[in-house]
């Protein structure tokens, strides 16, 4: 502003009247505005306090839930470790049982194979004996047929019958 505008009575200037209106406005409505403003700020502060209380409560609940989750995690890890150890032990027992079963099966099969071999050997020996006995009996028959005639058979039978009582006494 310029100096010539400020000269004269203060009520002749618009700045004076704006200041008066401003003061008058605050005198008339200041208490209502101040009351409304403070009540609004108080309600906002109460709301903030409630939100903070709720946040603290939620934080405590979250911490409790976190602690519970950690405890359950530790329990689950312990349970998993126990189950894993149990599974390892069970697997070792199963492997040992399978090994024992396989060993027993091998022994049974070996015994069966040995039994089959022994049976085959016995059958072969019996067959050879039978064949040898058959060959010997045929050879004896041929020799007897060549050496002795039809009359010699009767003499042999008579001789065998006469020796029979001695053989029975000796036995």
Curated annotation (Swiss-Prot):
Q: Which residues cross the membrane?
A: 9-29
Keywords carried by this UniProt record: ATP synthesis, Cell inner membrane, Cell membrane, CF(0), Hydrogen ion transport, Ion transport, Membrane, Transmembrane, Transmembrane helix, Transport
Quote the Pfam families the UniProt record gives.
ATP-synt_B
InterPro entries linked to this entry: ATP_synth_b/b'su_bac/chlpt (IPR002146), ATP_synthase_B_chain (IPR050059)
* Principal location: membrane
Give the membrane topology, semicolon-separated if more than one.
Answer: Single-pass membrane protein
Determine if Cell inner membrane is one of this entry's keywords.
yes
Which GO CC terms are listed, alphabetically?
plasma membrane; proton-transporting ATP synthase complex
Q: Per UniProt, what is one GO molecular function of this protein?
A: proton-transporting ATP synthase activity, rotational mechanism
- Where's it found, cell-wise? Cell inner membrane
Q: Which PANTHER family match?
A: ATP SYNTHASE SUBUNIT B, ATP SYNTHASE SUBUNIT B', CHLOROPLASTIC
* Subunit structure, interactors included: F-type ATPases have 2 components, F(1) - the catalytic core - and F(0) - the membrane proton channel. F(1) has five subunits: alpha(3), beta(3), gamma(1), delta(1), epsilon(1). F(0) has three main subunits: a(1), b(2) and c(10-14). The alpha and beta chains form an alternating ring which encloses part of the gamma chain. F(1) is attached to F(0) by a central stalk formed by the gamma and epsilon chains, while a peripheral stalk is formed by the delta and b chains.
What protein name is recorded for this chain?
Answer: ATP synthase subunit b 2
Q: Which organism is it from?
A: Granulibacter bethesdensis (strain ATCC BAA-1260 / CGDNIH1)
Q: Which gene encodes it?
A: atpF2
């Amino acid at each position: 502003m310029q100096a010539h505008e400020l000269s004269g009575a203060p009520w002749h200037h618009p700045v004076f009247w704006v200041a008066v209106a401003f003061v008058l406005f605050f005198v008339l409505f200041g208490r209502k505005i101040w009351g409304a403003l403070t009540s609004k700020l108080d309600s906002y502060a109460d709301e903030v306090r409630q939100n903070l209380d709720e946040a603290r409560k939620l934080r405590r609940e979250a911490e409790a839930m976190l602690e519970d989750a950690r405890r359950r995690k530790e329990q689950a890890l312990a349970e998993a470790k126990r189950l894993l150890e149990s599974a390892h032990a069970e697997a070792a027992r199963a492997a040992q049982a399978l090994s024992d079963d396989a060993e027993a099966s091998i022994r049974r099969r070996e015994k069966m194979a040995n039994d089959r071999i022994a049976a085959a050997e016995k059958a072969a020996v019996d067959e050879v004996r039978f064949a040898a006995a058959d060959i010997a009996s045929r050879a004896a028959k041929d020799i007897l047929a060549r050496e002795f005639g039809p009359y010699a058979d009767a003499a042999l039978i008579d001789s065998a019958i006469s020796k029979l009582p001695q053989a029975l006494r000796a036995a």
